Regions:
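C-terminal substrate-binding subdomain of Rossmann-fold SDR/epimerase-dehydratase oxidoreductases
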Residues: 137-271
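Conserved Rossmann-fold cofactor-binding substructure of NAD(P)-dependent oxidoreductases
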Residues: 1-14
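Active-site segment of SDR-like NAD(P)-dependent oxidoreductases
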Residues: 22-25, 63-72, 80, 113-119, ...
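A hydrophobic alpha-helix adjacent to the NAD(P)-binding/active-site core of NAD(P)-dependent oxidoreductases
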Residues: 6, 34-35, 49
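Short alpha-helix in the Rossmann-fold core of NAD(P)-dependent oxidoreductases
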Residues: 20, 30, 35-42, 58-61, ...
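Conserved Rossmann-fold NAD(P)-dependent oxidoreductase catalytic core, especially the SDR/UDP-sugar
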Residues: 17, 43-85, 99-108
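Short alpha-helical oligomerization interface
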Residues: 24-41, 74-82
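Active-site Tyr-X1-5-Lys
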Residues: 68, 81-118, 136-146
């Protein structure tokens, strides 16, 4: 199905662009694949949106566009310096959206930190094949549904040697998308582009997240130690004050809730 046909049939006034490959390590081994799928194909979507009079576009970007942090708390004004093809692909889309503002498109790039959690009822959640995300891997390990989790690097310049990440619940992310869309549609001017950090504003190390999983599950998480994963930053924690102020967004579900929801989902998940 051609994009032009879809736009002509449904005549959308707004687009929420969530699609794309997301694995940092895989992108290092397959850079052309990531740049083609994530960046080049997004260019096609942006051009189609402009041709068909779309007024607003919300894009799922990533905190990985910042690269190696220059400050403890990353604000949207931090330099953009991707260190993986995945991050570069997202940065390219952000640049394309910024350029499209000159042609009248309103857009928001939502820079996710570490998306986590699942539906509170356990009806839906992430199910990658193979799974690469920390919380579902830790959940499977502690529930006996998967192998021991491997800590990818324990020699980072952090207090316990493991990476520090800012985890944000997927339900809070969903709320942010709706708020961003509403913000764009209410904007008085045509042709704007803004980026917003979406995180919790607090950092937890990989070791801390594993320990919290063990506490909630009631017993230790089997784990081993492995080498660093190419393209990983030692610490990524977001300053979310802009999203709070501009979008009226506040994350409501902390790491414990994210882990509880992940455990519930992994128990129920079809395999």
């Amino acid at each position: 199905v051609r994009l032009d046909d879809v736009f002509s049939r449904h005549r959308p006034t707004a687009v929420i662009h969530l699609a794309g490959y997301i694995e940092v390590g895989e992108s290092v081994n397959q850079p052309e694949r990531y740049l083609h799928n994530n960046a080049a194909k997004s260019d096609i979507l942006i051009e189609a949106s402009l041709r068909h009079g779309v007024e607003a576009l919300v894009f799922s970007s990533t905190c990985a566009v910042y690269g190696l942090p220059q400050t403890d708390l990353l604000a949207e004004t931090h330099r953009i310096a991707p260190i993986s093809p995945y991050a570069e692909s997202k940065a390219r889309v952000e640049r394309a959206l910024a350029a499209a503002a000159a042609r009248g498109l309103r857009s928001a790039a939502l820079r996710y930190f570490n998306a986590a959690g699942a539906d509170a009822e356990g009806a839906i959640g992430e199910a990658h094949h193979p799974e690469t995300h920390l919380l579902p891997l830790a959940a499977d390990a502690v529930l006996g549904l998967g192998p021991a989790i491997t800590l990818l690097g324990t020699d980072y310049p952090t207090p316990d040697g493991s990476c520090i990440r800012d985890f944000v619940h997927v339900s809070d992310l969903a709320d942010a998308h709706l708020r961003a869309l509403d913000w764009l549609q209410r904007a008085p001017q045509r042709g704007i582009h803004q980026a917003f950090n979406l995180g919790s504003g607090a950092g937890y190390s990989v070791r801390q997240a594993i320990a919290e999983t063990a506490r909630i599950a009631g017993h230790a998480v089997p784990h081993t130690v492995g080498p660093r994963r190419p393209g990983d930053s030692p610490k990524l924690v977001g300053d979310i004050s802009k999203a709070r102020h501009e979008l009226g967004w506040t994350p409501k579900r902390d790491l414990a809730v994210q882990i509880e929801d992940t455990l519930r989902w992994r128990r129920k998940m079809p395999r």
